[in-house]
Amino acid sequence: MKPTIALVGRPNVGKSTLFNRLTRTKDALVHDLPGLTRDRHYGHGKVGSKPYLVIDTGGFEPVVDSGILHEMAKQTLQAVDEADAVVFLVDGRTGLTPQDKIIADRLRQSPRPVYLAVNKGEGGNRAVLAAEFYELALGDPYVISGAHGDGVYYLIEDILETFPEPEKEEEEAKHPVFAVIGRPNVGKSTLVNAILGEERVIAFDMAGTTRDSIHIDFEREGKPFTIIDTAGVRRRGKVDEAVEKFSVIKAMQAVEAANVAVLVLDAQQDIADQDATIAGFALEAGRALVVAVNKWDGISEERREQVKRDINRKLYFLDFAKFHFISALKERGIDGLFDSIQAAYNAAMIKMPTPKITRVLQSAIERQQPPRAGLVRPKMRYAHQGGMNPPVIVVHGNSLHAISDSYTRYLTQTFRKAFNLQGTPLRIQYNVSENPYENADDKPKKKPLRRVSLSNRIEKREGRKEEKNRFKKKTKVSVKKQFSK
């Protein structure tokens, strides 16, 4: 599993800038989906062969006891507890502040390794900038510049050095491996116990079971499944929804390890931004998705209609997923949930023949050609499969950069219907045929066209006339001389 690195520090020390540097992006979130710009930002990065996850926490105000800043501080402490390593960022220009000392005191109590990074150190004397921060007793400071990248590589390299090399990926599971994800108190633990049944009662008292994911293999109607339980499987009588915690980090880690995600919603509560955020994790990771709307038995018919309207309005980007309305406590609707998990897995792992993909593409073009972009009309020639989990279709042709988002959605729906891709995201990539001579030094130079202007023609004509006149004069002179003789 990828190590998780949390960026911590007071406001305006450059956490977001360093985050962008580590993830090599300006925004690692899922486009403009609702709810994805709040709480903690997350992103993926890689140094050499070692991948990692980065969490950009909010500005840490440890002295605030209430309000939104207090909530941000609580989220930051939770991120510290659940991360594998912590980067404590301070401002080299401002110098050491009382807030930095309070944060350092909190971080020294954490069992996670803490790396002190002095940011905004470009152009300065590293030894001088780092000197006063030794007072924090967090080891040798790393003087870096998140904006320019100075020292960032050495920092992340030292962090990842403590983690083992990623093992070669084992042969991918030939059956659904799914994770139950969702915000706190929606009934995830109840659903896990309902899925595993009465005969599978496991209590984990070992340290770390509330932080590490547990893979449990089981069978349902003769079909193999693996469930990833991030909260530990507890006895039915010990499930306490009030204290159940499922953090953003755990959701990320669970989605990374699974090939299908089961998103649990609470029908008794409104669809929240955090629901969309967690759904966005699965969508960005390209995981097949099944949505379970829990506690359906405890609401009125009027409330049910309201929930369906909210889902259509707030989770419109999950139109490919199958929705199930269940009761985990009474184990209602669980069988249908498994059918959709299996179907979503099959769709995510589908192998599509190239001839059929190209035929579907050509028929889609015949029904509706891509619109022109100025004087250019994109021309699509053929397509083939470029990957699985999620399925990727690569389209080849010319001027494909001019294809609009609406036409891409049209192609996505066409391929989804043709191959019955229910429950999985589908990605379309455009591969434009390259001109081998474009921007090449050895590009053959075009010969200039031989064009003779009107003025040149007149000059030549006048020149010929003058030449004829001179010739006539010469001949007349020579004739006179002959006659004179």
UniProtKB/Swiss-Prot annotation:
Keywords linked to the UniProt accession: GTP-binding, Nucleotide-binding, Repeat, Ribosome biogenesis
Residues that bind GTP 2: 182-189, 229-233, 294-297
Composition bias type Basic residues, residue spans: 470-485
One BP annotation, GO: ribosome biogenesis
Signal sequence interval, chain numbering: none
Annotated family: Belongs to the TRAFAC class TrmE-Era-EngA-EngB-Septin-like GTPase superfamily. EngA (Der) GTPase family.
Name used for this protein in its record: GTPase Der
